[in-house]
Design a protein with these regions (language model features):
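Acidic, glycine-anchored loop motifs typical of Ca2+
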Residues: 17-28, 136-137
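Periplasmic solute-binding protein
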Residues: 1, 33-55, 144-153
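Extracytoplasmic/periplasmic substrate-recognition and gating elements
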Residues: 116-172
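Pocket-flanking alpha-helical
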Residues: 9-19, 113-116
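Short helices/loops that flank or line small-molecule/ion binding pockets
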Residues: 8-13, 91-106
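Beta->alpha turn/N-cap motifs
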Residues: 35-38, 108-113
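Glycine-centered hinge/linker elements that transmit conformational signals in sensory
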Residues: 4-13, 41-45, 49-89
Length: 172
């Protein structure tokens, strides 16, 4: 079953000291390449949200006991499995290393799939694992660094000016 514990066990099994020097670096095979947002991404995969709707009103849901229990469990597991994980924001280094077989898994936003085209290697695409067997659906995350949302309050006095400013800020 594709659940968090199975995934992390596979991550642990993916660590191999390829050069036999007892040190794990880019010359070895890791269980997982990932950005520092792993815990957040695993939380999103549980299907829970930081906000909830209560009679049509949005409220913060992070303080609910189930959310706190899940976040605590994910945090504990990420810390326990951290030795098998290469955490880096340097995707320009990670992608060629992944293509060369230096990691069993690479968790990244789908935008980066096109960057794999320049390499000749077989790759599969998996959803983030379910938290446990009680979860009905697989849930994916939208990375805040790649997709930025901005809202204009319905009672804004200057919505057109705000829209022009947002448009200008998002221009390349």
């Amino acid at each position: 079953k594709w659940v968090l514990d199975t995934f992390l066990d596979m991550v642990a099994g993916g660590l191999v000291d390829l050069n036999g020097d007892g040190q794990y670096d880019d010359n070895d095979q890791w269980g997982l390449f990932v950005q520092p947002t792993l815990g957040q991404n695993l939380f999103y995969a549980t299907g829970n949200s930081f906000i909830a709707k209560d009679n049509g009103t949005l409220k913060i849901a992070m303080g609910e006991e189930r959310h706190l229990d899940i976040m605590s469990d994910i945090s504990d597991k990420v810390l326990r499995f951290k030795p098998y994980i290469n955490i880096s924001n340097d995707y320009q280094a990670m992608i060629p290393l992944f293509a060369d077989g230096h990691s069993l898994f690479y968790s990244e936003v789908s935008l980066f799939i096109e960057r794999f085209r320049q390499y000749e290697f077989d790759v599969g695409i998996l959803p983030m694992p379910k938290y446990d067997l009680n979860q009905d659906d697989y849930c994916q995350f939208a990375d805040g660094g790649c997709i930025s949302l901005a809202g204009i309050p319905i009672d804004s006095k200057y919505p057109d000016d705000t829209a022009i400013l947002l448009d200008a800020l998002s221009a390349e």
